[in-house]
Amino acid sequence: MQEKVGTAVLECGIGGEYDSTNVLVKPSATGVTSLGIDHTAMLGETIESIAWHKAGIFKEGVPAFTASQAPSALKVLHERAEERKTQLQEVPRYTALDQVKLGLHGDFQMINASVAIAVCASHLQKMGYSNLPDPQNKDTALPEEFVRGLEQVRLGGRCEIRPDNARKDMTWYIDGGHTLESIEMAGRWFATIAAQSSGDKQGTTRILIFNQQTRDAGSLARKLHDTLAAATGDSHPFKHAIFCTNTTYRDAGFKADLVSMNTNKDDVDTLKVQKELAGAWDGIDPEASVHVLSTIEEAIARARELAANDKTEVLVTGSLHLVGGVIEVLESQGSGSSTL
């Protein structure tokens, strides 16, 4: 209020029912994107429980929007909307997005973009603007200002592509997927990359850098492999799989803003999770060479060593802390910003 902000977009930290964003008792609109199983210690272990928490942002008389959800989750969202005396609208995927070069990679981002369009249109209508998209009409037209915003949007660490300045033929594909649903989306996205260069498979080295320190890491790794195998028809999607902790640098340790307070220090120091992942990947894909390393910096260096002079595609996924650390190290070493 002191800064006289005209429009603010606030994202919940975890959940919604008990989130600090509820300090705003009368927002102009609320939105829920695609739900997945995450933060189960606080939100519960079922999609219905998570939906209940997420719907905690709904406010009386304030328009509420949601992406398509599992039927059981959608039922909970509607029940919660009724409790809060508001109407919940399920947002369609807008056909006009097919003509937009969205600034974010990944087909699933079209769903997120649709929710953003609906929430934005509702907010702008309250501010007195006209000629806005109709949130309930999947064939609604998008004004030029909406198209420009969608094309210029950037989100680091989500379906992000970065060239490696140290090696001309090396490219980093970075996505912070860390739930079964989001890791599947990351796998599908990378599968499209693999398909584009499938004719040159013999000359392309594909490397995985993966970690997930606090969730069921083995299940996430298997989901990633199975998604890629199904999408590409190749049961050996990576020549090398590197498992490292989220520790940023070999000598300096964590960069301050990349520290996770939810990890077990002993597990990190002994590489417990990484060794378990290495064993799991040996069972998933015995043909891949598996590497266990202590830090992100060392994982990046190993990937460059393994690349030799081949065309190399490196997928980094499994953890937002891992992704943040990889971007930090790459940028500190002068590797390029993201490309479209």
Task: Give the ranges of each region predicted by the language model.
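Active-site-proximal loop/hinge segments that shape catalytic or ion-binding/gating pockets
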Residues: S319
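Flexible active-site lid/hinge loop adjacent to a nucleotide/diphosphate
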Residues: M1-S68
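Active-site-adjacent alpha-helix immediately C-terminal to a catalytic or transition-state-stabilizing loop
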Residues: G324-T339
